[in-house]
Structure formats: C-alpha cells, structure tokens
From Swiss-Prot:
Keyword match Oxidoreductase: yes
PROSITE patterns: ALDOKETO_REDUCTASE_2 (PS00062)
GO molecular-function terms, A-Z: aldo-keto reductase (NADPH) activity
Protein name as annotated: Aldo-keto reductase MMAR_1744
Source species: Mycobacterium marinum (strain ATCC BAA-535 / M)
Amino acid sequence: MPGAPSPSAPSIALNDENTMPVLGMGVAGLSDDETERAVSAALEIGCRLIDTAAAYGNEAAVGRAIAASGIPRAELFVTTKVATADHGFTASREACKASLDRLGLDYVDLYLIHWPAPAAGKYVDAFGGLIQARGEGFTRSIGVSNFTEEHVSNVIDLTFVTPAVNQVELHPLLNQDELRKANAQHNVVTQSYTPLALGQLADNPTVTSIAGEYGKTPTQVLLRWNLQLGNAVIFGSSNAEHIATNLDVFEFELASQHMDAINGLNDGTRLREDPMTFAGV
C-alpha cells in the first residue's frame, strides 16, 4: 500500500452551485471484492470521488468501503447512475432510493442517467425523475452520461433544467471536441470516462515520447491531457499503486505543443457503444 495520502484533487464548479473533484475513480467491471479493495485503497491514498452505477452491481461494495474508511461523508463525492430499465419519471426516482439503500448512504452527490437509449424514448421522463429525486434530497446534483448534444438539448428544452454533468467516452482517439463545446455552451461539465483509451495508447510513440520528456508515465500524460482540456476525469483501476500514480497529475503541466500532438491522435475511434443506437444497460 502506498504511504502518505496524496493531496485531494482540485474541485470544479457545477452549474447548481455545488462542486466536484476534477479527478476520481470508477469501479466499472470490478467484482465486489475488487471494488471494496480498490475503493478502500483509493480513499486511503486521498481520492475523494468514487463513481459507480446500478448496472455495475457493486454499489453495496462501494458503500462498505466508504463506511469502513471512517472519512466524514461531507468530504466524499459519490456518483451513481440509473439503469435503462428504470427510465421513466417514477422509476428513476425509485431507482435512486434503491441505490441509496445499497450504498448505505442518505444521499449521493451526483445521480446520472447511464445511457440515453433513444429508441426507448424515455430519457427525458427519466430526467424528470432525477429532478424529483434532487428535490427530495436523494442527490445533490443530477446529470447525464453518454448523451449527445441532441440528447442534452432535448432534456433542457423539455424539463427546463440543465444537467450539471455529461459523462462521456473521451480520450485522444475520440476527443469529443464538438460535444465539449456544446456542453460548455450549456454550462455543463464534461466528465471523461475511459481516459486511458482502454490501454490502447499505453505504447503509442507520441504518448510515450511525451511521457519521457516529463519523467511521467503514459497514463499520467493521458490524464493530464484530459484535465488540461478542462474536463473532469474518471479513471478505473483495481491496483493501489496505479491508483496513486493516476492521482499524481497536478504537479506538472503539458506544454501547448504536447497538447497539440496528443490532440492529433484523434481519429474518431469509439471504444464503447454508440449512444445513438445502444439500448443501454
């Protein structure tokens, strides 16, 4: 286990007067045991944002690790997400309550619609349920995940409420430049998941060369690039040493030519499902 906790990540302002750490850890794909160990390690190291989802099946494990940490609830930022099966006004509100029960928490800091699943046509109703959940104190902030510019605009136009966050696939191969601009116009924070492109850039010559110049790992360079774009970022790991390394990205800054070089890797490669056609989880 790494030693002293690293400094907590800086925070970014949300459009609802709340704040969120710009960097945190997600637990997608981890078993209960892996989740409990990873979250415990992350919290001990200094991470304060933990991202889970109903569809991950590990909310209870996240809750156990949080409870065991002894860290005051107010110091943590916990995100979870509503599954597509629970789209709908009443269903999404009830799903939030069920997530709280599994987490063992009185509230979450951010509740997201996991996927728009546009063919089902219920994501706007689901967001209405999130508005209700926020009003009842189940969540501090509400947002969306995997939403396109069209989906975000529909939610705003039909509910008159702007999501605080849009969490999307975003990495140098898919830098989401247009979507980031659209989010910013709505004052929606863009939060990147898969910032490491599922390992596909670990040996990329551009990335490794830049990492060598700064004495950093390719992972640190990829996270730093994302943060310098102005995004919030969620990384995934079950390894305590990797978690510590991933959190240690606030003591250096990439020069503009290196940012440009990484931007040049963008070729539109999508590693996760297409939000326009995916039926969701």
